[in-house]
Amino acid sequence: MILKTLAAAAAFACTLSLPAFAAVDAEAAVKLNKDSGCTKCHSVDKAKKGPAYQKTAAKYKGKADGEAKLVDLLTKSPKVKMDDGTEEEHKAAATKDAAQVKNLAQWILAQ
């Protein structure tokens, strides 16, 4: 009995030590993606004028600053190199709400 209690307590303690991740609101991310005009240059699985989101997610996978880099890209409109070699200004997301932009970045990374 004591062993079961200790095992349960240890398992519970381990779950508390895991980082807390909020679930991505996919519906809101897809809406912001569409409203921002992102689908003109990007899709989830096919390269268009810009890279597919799956390629972007793979590029940043496992990198601690991946989400922050995407948030910067979605808010600061930097010059980006297109798949065809040209450069142009990346369009910012159609919101100033940091939580919505972060949700969109997390959705892209989840692809």
Regions found by a protein language model. Name each.
Residues 37-44, 104:
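The canonical Cys-X-X-Cys-His
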Residues 46, 63-68:
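Alpha-helix N-cap/helix-initiation sites
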Residues 5, 25-26, 66-70, 83-84, ...:
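Extracytoplasmic c-type cytochrome modules immediately beyond a signal peptide or single-pass transmembrane anchor
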Residues 18-33, 59-63:
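Electrostatic cytochrome c docking/interface patches
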Residues 46-60, 73-105:
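Axial heme c-ligation environment in periplasmic c-type cytochrome domains
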Residues 35-36, 77:
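Structured helix-beta-strand junction loops
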Residues 1-26, 105-111:
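Post-cleavage N-terminal segment of exported redox proteins
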